[in-house]
Swiss-Prot record:
One of its GO terms (biological process) is 'de novo' NAD biosynthetic process from L-aspartate. Catalyzes the condensation of iminoaspartate with dihydroxyacetone phosphate to form quinolinate. It is found in: Cytoplasm. Iminosuccinate binds at H44, S61, Y139, I140, N141, S160, H254, P255, E256, T271. It catalyses: iminosuccinate + dihydroxyacetone phosphate = quinolinate + phosphate + 2 H2O + H(+). This is Quinolinate synthase. It comes from Listeria innocua serovar 6a (strain ATCC BAA-680 / CLIP 11262). [4Fe-4S] cluster binds at C108, C228, C318. Its cofactor is [4Fe-4S] cluster. The keyword Metal-binding applies. The keyword Membrane does not apply. InterPro entries: NadA, NadA_sf, Quinolinate_synth_A_type3.
C-alpha cells in the first residue's frame, strides 16, 4: 500500500458528513444489535454527548483499564477515547481481540509532552545525580513506550483515581520518584502525602536538565515538566470570582489543575469522584467544576436539581479528546460489519511485555 492509498483508507468518506443524526443513530443502533457481545464500546467521561449513549461502559481511565482487562468476550473493542487509552486496552486484552480508535487524530497533548527519546536521555542523567534511588511512575496518560520504560525499570502506572495509594507505595520502594508526564498531578499527590514543595524538583525535557535550587539529598519527587492544556486554564482568579459572586458554591476540581488552584478548591479528584460527589449531593446544592467542558455539561444535564457551573466560564472542550464523533463511530462500525479492518491500535510485543508490568502493578495495588 502506497502513501496515497494509506491516506485514503484512513480518511472518512464525505458521505458520512451528509447523513442526518437520525440516520446515523439508526445505523449505529442496528449494527450494535447485530454484533451483540462481539462488540464492546468503552467511552471516557470526556467524550461528546453524541457518542456516549452508545457506550457499553463509561468511566475514567482506571475504570476503563479495569474493564478492558476483564473483558474476554468481545472480538472488537471500539474505544471512544484517545490514543493512549486504546493502546492500554490493546495491551490488557488478548491477541484475538481487536482494538480500534474511530478517529486516529484523537490524542492527548499531555501524553505527547513525554517522548520516549527524551525519557531515555533523562534517565542516565538522573542516575548520575541520584544513583539507584529513583522509581519511575507514569500517569496512565502516556504512550505505551513510556509505560514500557517505566515497567522495565520497576515502576508503575497511576491514574487520578488511585494516585495517592500508588505514589505512597512508590515512595516506600525507593528514596524518590520520577513522576511523568503531568507535573501537577504529581505535585498535588506528593503534597497530599506530606512532601513539602521545596522537596520537589522539575525535570525539563526540552533542556534535558534538572530545575532545582535545593540540596539534592532533600529532593524526594522529580516532576516531568508536562501538563494538561485544559486543566491548566483553571486559575486562582476563577476561584476568587466564584467565592465573590457565589459564596455558597462548592468548588471541586481535577488534580491535573495547578497546585494553587487545587489548594484553594474545596475538593479535588478524578472524573469518577467529581461525578459521584455531585450526584450524591443534596438537591439545591451549588457547584463550580474544574474539569473538561463535555463532562461538566453532562453533569449539569444529569443533575437538574442542583446549580452547577464550570469554574472557568470560557472553557472549551479538549480539542484532541473531542475528536470522536457520531460519523467516525458509524464509519468504524460499518467497517467491522463489512469485515474490514480500520484504525486498529496494535502495540508491539516488546513494548507490551514491559508496559504490562507497570499496568499490572497498578491494577494489583488498586
Amino acid at each position: 500500500m502506497n502513501l496515497l492509498e494509506k491516506v485514503e483508507q484512513d480518511t472518512m468518506p464525505a458521505r458520512y458528513k451528509h447523513m442526518t443524526s437520525q440516520e446515523m443513530i439508526a445505523r449505529v443502533t442496528e449494527i450494535k444489535a447485530q454484533l451483540g457481545e462481539d462488540l464492546f464500546i468503552p467511552c471516557h467521561h470526556y467524550q461528546k454527548d453524541e457518542v456516549v449513549p452508545f457506550a457499553d461502559a463509561i468511566g475514567d481511565s482506571l475504570q476503563l483499564a479495569q474493564i478492558a482487562a476483564n473483558n474476554k468476550k468481545a472480538k472488537h473493542i471500539v474505544f471512544c477515547g484517545v490514543h493512549f487509552m486504546a493502546e492500554t486496552a490493546d495491551m490488557l486484552t488478548t491477541n484475538e481481540q481487536i482494538v480500534t480508535l474511530p478517529d486516529m487524530r484523537a490524542g492527548c497533548s499531555m501524553a505527547d509532552m513525554a517522548d520516549i527519546h527524551q525519557l531515555t536521555n533523562a534517565w542516565p542523567k538522573l542516575q548520575h545525580l541520584f544513583g539507584d534511588t529513583i522509581l519511575p511512575v507514569t500517569y496512565i496518560n502516556s504512550t505505551a513506550a513510556i509505560k514500557s520504560f517505566v515497567g522495565e525499570h520497576g515502576g508503575t502506572t497511576v491514574t487520578s483515581s488511585n494516585a495517592t495509594k500508588i505514589v505512597s507505595w512508590a515512595l516506600q520502594q525507593k528514596e524518590r520518584i520520577f513522576f511523568l508526564p503531568d507535573q501537577h498531578l504529581g505535585r498535588n499527590t506528593a503534597f497530599e502525602l506530606g512532601i513539602p514543595l521545596e522537596h520537589m524538583a522539575i525535570w525539563n525535557p526540552i533542556k534535558n536538565e534538572l530545575e532545582y535550587d535545593g540540596n539534592l539529598d532533600d529532593c524526594k519527587v522529580i516532576l516531568w515538566k508536562g501538563y494538561c492544556s485544559v486543566h491548566q486554564h483553571f486559575t486562582v482568579k476563577n476561584i476568587e470570582n466564584i467565592r465573590k459572586n457565589h459564596p455558597n458554591m462548592r468548588i471541586i476540581v481535577h488534580p491535573e489543575c495547578t497546585h494553587e488552584v487545587v489548594s484553594l478548591a474545596d475538593d479535588s479528584g478524578s472524573t469518577k469522584k467529581i461525578v459521584t460527589e455531585i450526584s450524591n449531593a443534596a438537591p439545591g446544592t451549588e457547584w463550580a467544576v474544574g474539569t473538561e467542558a463535555n463532562l461538566v455539561g453532562r453533569i449539569i444535564q444529569e443533575n437538574p436539581d442542583k446549580k452547577i457551573v464550570s469554574l472557568n466560564p470560557f472553557m472549551c472542550p479538549c480539542m484532541t479528546m473531542n475528536r470522536i464523533d457520531l460519523p467516525h463511530l458509524l464509519w468504524t462500525l460499518e467497517a467491522i460489519q463489512n469485515g474490514e479492518q480500520r484504525n486498529q491500535i496494535k502495540v508491539d510485543e516488546h513494548t507490551t511485555k514491559f508496559a504490562l508490568k507497570a499496568l499490572e502493578r497498578m491494577l494489583q495495588l488498586s
